[in-house]
C-alpha cells in the first residue's frame, strides 16, 4: 500500500515544524486527545496534512459545515494528490424530516432531494476504505448518522476477473441484489444494461462505466468506457464492483427482519390498546403493514431506514453502524474548528430523539425507529482511539480533555494579530463612516458585525446612501450566493459587508483591513470570548489589520479576547524580530474562493455550474451532458434552467473553438 506523500511548493515554516513534530510525537506516545491551537492564516491545513503523512494512518477530518468541508477537501487533495482524499457529507440538497406536531394534529411527511454527485462521492469514500490505507476522508457531521453494516456491505462486493467462468444470469441477479437497476435506455449511476454478450455497468462511485464482454459464460474482456461518448478507454484484468447503496440486505436477513417487525408490531399494538390509544394503534397497524407488504414484494419501502435495527439484526438501543465503523481501528480523527464541530456532534442525538419520540408516541412509527439515529457523543468517543482538535479558540471540552495543547501562532507570512481599539458608542456611526472611507480610499475592504438583523439592514442602507458600496449578508442567503458575495467583496464590487454571525470561521479575505464590532459590550453568544477572537481573526490576513470595538464598558469576554490577541501578537513580533522577518500581505487568487467550493459543494446540483474542464475531451463530455440536461429541463417546462444551460453550452463551444491549448491538448 502506498504511503502518504506531501506535494507542495512550500516547506514547513514559522510554527508549523514544531507543531507537526509535537503532534506526531504525541500520537506515537499514545496520547488520546490533543489540540492544535492555530491562529487564522498560520497554515493549519498544511500542518494537518503533514501530521497525516508523518503518522501514515487513515484519517477522518470532521468539519462543521459543507462549505468548509469542501474547502478543506480541495486543499487536502492539493497537498496529497497521490493519495485517496475523499468527501463525505449529507447527500441531501433539500431535506424535510418526518415529523408530527401534536398541537396542530399535523403530520409532515419526509421530503428530500438527493444530490447524485454527493452520493457518488460518499460511495467513493467507503470504497477507498476497503481497498487502501492511504485514505483521508473529509466529512461533515453526517458521518455519525446510520450507514449500512460494513461486513454486510463487503459481502455483496462482486469480483470480476478476465478469464473467469461465471454465468451471466447469476451476475445479473447479483447486481440486482446489490441495488443496481437494469435500464437499457437511461444508462446512468447505479444502473446496468445487457446487449447480446456485452454487459455494461455504471458503478455508483465512478465517473466511468465498465464493459464486460462474454464468450459463452467466460469473461473475455473487461474495459472502462466513457458513459456519454461510449469511447473505450482502458483494459482491466480484474475489478471489484461495490453495491449501489450502502444499505444492502440479503434475502435471508430480510425475511428475519420482517418477522422481527411483525413481532414488535404485535407487542406495540397491545401496549397502545391497553392505554386506550385506539386511533394510534389503528394508524400504526395500517402504516406498518403497508411497509411490510412493500418490503416483501419490492425489497424496500419508503422510510425503510426506520427499520434499520431489524434489517441489521441489532439489539434494541444499540448504536447504529456509521462511517466510523468502515475505518480500521487505528484511524486518526481530526476535528476542524472543534469549538463549533464538537457541540454540533454532541447535540445531534438529543434533537433526533425528541422528534422520533413524538412519532412513536402517536402511532406513526414503531419504537425501533428510535434506533435509526446518529451516534451519541459517548458512542462517538468510544469509536475514536486518538483525536486532534483544531481551532483558534478551543472550547471547554478540548481544554479539559487534551493531554497536550500545541500552539501555532506564527504565520509563514510574518503577519501579526490585528491592532485592537475600543471606542465609545456615542457617535459610533459617524466615526465608523470615517474609518470606512479611509479604507475605501486605500482600496481595502471592511467587515462590520452587528447584533440584530434590523441594525444590519439599517446600517447597510445608510452606508449605501453615503456612497459606500455595501452589501448586507443575512442568514437567508444560500451557500453559493454567500460565496459569490464574498468573492465580489474581494473583487471590489463591494467595499463593505455588514452581517451578524456570518463573518467567522474559515473565510479567506486578505483584502479586509478593518473589522468593526458594534455593541461589543453586550455579553452573550455573539460577543463571547470565542466569538470575538474568531471575528477579530478576519482582519489578521492584512498587513494593516485593525479591529475597532464600539462599547461603553469593557466586559470580561472583551478583556480576555484582547489579552489573548495581545499575547499572540507579542509572540509573533518576537519571532519576526529574532528571524528578521518583515510581515507580507497574502496574495490569493480570487477565483479560488469560488471555483473551489463550486466544484464540490452539495448546494450546487447541476452541471451548468461546474468550472470549465481543462482538457478538450472533458469539455466535449460536459457539453454532451449539458445538452441532455437542457432537453430534460425543457421537457419539465423548466425553461429558465434550460436557457441557463444553453448559454453555458454556447460558452463551452466557443472555448473549444478559440482556445489553442484545448485544441492541442490531446496531442501533447
Curated annotation (Swiss-Prot):
Residues of the Helicase C-terminal domain: 428-594
Entries under CDD domains matching the protein: DEXHc_UvrB, SF2_C_UvrB
Domain UVR intervals: 620-655
Binding of ATP, residues: 38-45
Record's GO cellular component terms: cytoplasm; excinuclease repair complex
InterPro entries: Helicase/UvrB_N, Helicase_ATP-bd, Helicase_C-like, P-loop_NTPase, UVR_dom, UVR_dom_sf, UvrB, UvrB_inter
Ranges spanned by the short sequence motif Beta-hairpin, renumbered to the chain: 91-114
Annotated Gene3D superfamilies: P-loop containing nucleotide triphosphate hydrolases, UVR domain
Domain of life: Bacteria
One MF annotation (Gene Ontology) recorded for this entry: DNA binding
UniProt keyword terms in alphabetical order: ATP-binding, Cytoplasm, DNA damage, DNA excision, DNA repair, Excision nuclease, Nucleotide-binding, SOS response
Subunit structure: Forms a heterotetramer with UvrA during the search for lesions. Interacts with UvrC in an incision complex.
Protein name from the UniProt record: UvrABC system protein B
Source organism (scientific name): Dehalococcoides mccartyi (strain ATCC BAA-2266 / KCTC 15142 / 195)
Gene that this polypeptide is encoded by: uvrB
Amino acid at each position: 500500500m502506498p504511503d502518504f506523500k506531501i506535494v507542495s511548493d512550500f516547506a514547513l515554516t514559522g510554527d508549523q515544524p514544531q507543531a507537526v513534530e509535537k503532534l506526531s510525537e504525541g500520537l506515537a506516545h499514545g496520547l488520546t486527545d490533543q489540540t492544535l491551537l492555530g491562529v487564522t492564516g498560520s497554515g493549519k491545513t498544511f500542518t494537518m496534512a503533514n501530521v497525516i503523512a508523518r503518522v501514515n494512518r487513515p484519517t477522518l477530518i470532521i468539519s462543521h459545515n459543507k462549505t468548509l468541508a469542501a474547502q478543506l477537501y480541495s486543499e487536502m487533495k492539493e497537498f496529497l494528490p497521490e493519495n485517496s482524499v475523499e468527501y463525505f457529507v449529507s447527500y441531501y440538497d433539500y431535506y424535510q424530516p418526518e415529523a408530527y406536531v401534536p398541537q396542530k394534529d399535523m403530520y409532515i411527511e419526509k421530503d428530500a432531494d438527493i444530490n447524485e454527485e454527493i452520493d457518488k462521492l460518499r460511495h467513493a469514500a467507503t470504497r477507498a476504505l476497503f481497498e487502501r490505507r492511504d485514505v483521508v476522508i473529509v466529512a461533515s457531521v453526517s458521518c455519525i448518522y446510520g450507514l449500512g453494516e460494513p461486513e454486510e456491505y463487503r459481502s455483496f462486493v462482486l469480483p470480476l476477473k478476465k478469464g473467469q467462468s461465471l454465468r451471466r444470469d447469476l451476475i445479473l441477479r447479483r447486481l440486482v441484489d446489490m441495488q443496481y437497476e437494469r435500464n437499457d435506455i437511461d444508462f446512468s449511476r447505479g444502473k446496468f444494461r445487457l446487449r447480446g454478450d456485452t454487459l455494461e455497468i455504471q458503478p455508483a462511485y465512478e465517473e466511468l462505466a465498465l464493459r464486460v464482454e462474454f464468450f459463452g459464460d467466460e469473461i473475455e474482456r473487461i474495459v472502462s468506457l466513457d458513459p456519454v461518448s461510449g469511447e473505450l478507454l482502458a483494459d482491466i484484468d480484474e475489478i471489484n464492483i461495490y453495491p449501489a447503496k450502502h444499505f444492502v440486505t440479503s434475502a435471508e436477513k430480510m425475511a428475519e427482519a420482517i418477522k422481527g417487525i411483525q413481532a414488535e408490531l404485535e407487542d406495540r399494538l397491545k401496549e397502545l390498546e391497553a392505554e386506550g390509544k385506539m386511533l394510534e394503534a389503528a394508524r400504526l397497524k395500517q402504516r406498518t403493514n403497508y411497509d411490510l407488504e412493500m418490503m416483501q414484494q419490492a425489497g424496500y419501502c419508503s422510510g425503510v431506514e426506520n427499520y434499520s435495527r431489524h434489517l441489521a439484526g441489532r439489539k434494541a438501543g444499540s448504536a447504529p453502524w456509521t462511517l466510523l465503523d468502515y475505518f480500521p481501528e487505528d484511524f486518526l480523527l481530526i476535528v476542524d474548528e472543534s469549538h463549533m464541530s464538537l457541540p454540533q456532534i454532541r447535540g445531534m442525538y438529543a434533537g433526533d430523539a425528541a422528534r422520533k419520540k413524538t412519532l412513536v408516541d402517536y402511532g406513526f412509527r414503531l419504537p425501533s425507529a428510535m434506533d435509526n439515529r446518529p451516534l451519541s457523543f459517548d458512542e462517538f468517543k468510544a469509536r475514536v482511539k486518538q483525536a486532534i482538535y483544531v481551532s483558534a479558540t478551543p472550547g471547554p471540552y478540548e481544554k479539559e480533555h487534551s493531554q497536550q495543547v500545541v500552539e501555532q501562532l506564527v504565520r509563514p507570512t510574518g503577519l501579526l494579530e490585528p491592532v485592537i481599539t475600543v471606542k465609545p458608542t456615542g457617535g459610533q456611526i459617524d466615526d465608523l463612516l470615517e474609518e470606512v472611507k479611509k479604507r475605501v480610499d486605500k482600496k481595502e475592504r471592511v467587515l462590520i458585525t452587528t447584533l440584530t438583523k434590523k441594525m444590519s439592514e439599517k446600517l447597510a442602507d445608510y452606508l449605501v446612501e453615503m456612497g459606500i458600496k455595501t452589501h448586507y449578508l443575512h442568514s437567508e442567503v444560500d451557500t453559493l450566493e454567500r460565496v459569490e458575495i464574498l468573492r465580489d467583496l474581494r473583487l471590489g464590487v463591494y467595499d463593505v459587508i455588514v452581517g451578524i454571525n456570518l463573518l467567522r470561521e474559515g473565510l479567506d479575505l486578505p483584502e479586509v483591513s478593518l473589522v468593526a464590532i458594534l455593541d461589543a459590550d453586550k455579553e452573550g453568544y455573539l460577543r463571547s470570548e470565542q466569538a470575538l477572537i474568531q471575528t477579530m481573526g478576519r482582519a489578521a490576513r492584512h498587513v494593516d489589520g485593525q479591529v475597532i470595538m464600539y462599547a461603553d464598558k469593557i466586559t470580561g469576554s472583551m478583556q480576555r479576547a484582547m489579552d489573548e490577541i495581545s499575547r499572540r501578537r507579542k509572540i509573533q513580533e518576537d519571532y519576526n524580530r529574532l528571524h528578521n522577518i518583515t510581515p507580507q500581505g497574502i496574495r490569493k487568487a480570487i477565483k479560488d474562493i469560488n471555483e473551489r467550493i463550486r466544484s464540490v459543494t452539495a448546494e450546487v446540483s447541476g452541471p451548468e455550474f461546474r468550472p470549465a474542464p481543462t482538457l478538450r475531451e472533458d469539455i466535449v463530455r460536459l457539453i454532451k451532458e449539458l445538452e441532455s440536461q437542457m432537453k430534460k429541463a425543457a421537457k419539465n417546462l423548466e425553461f429558465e434552467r434550460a436557457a441557463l444551460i444553453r448559454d453555458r453550452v454556447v460558452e463551452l463551444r466557443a472555448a473549444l473553438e478559440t482556445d489553442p491549448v484545448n485544441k492541442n491538448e490531446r496531442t501533447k
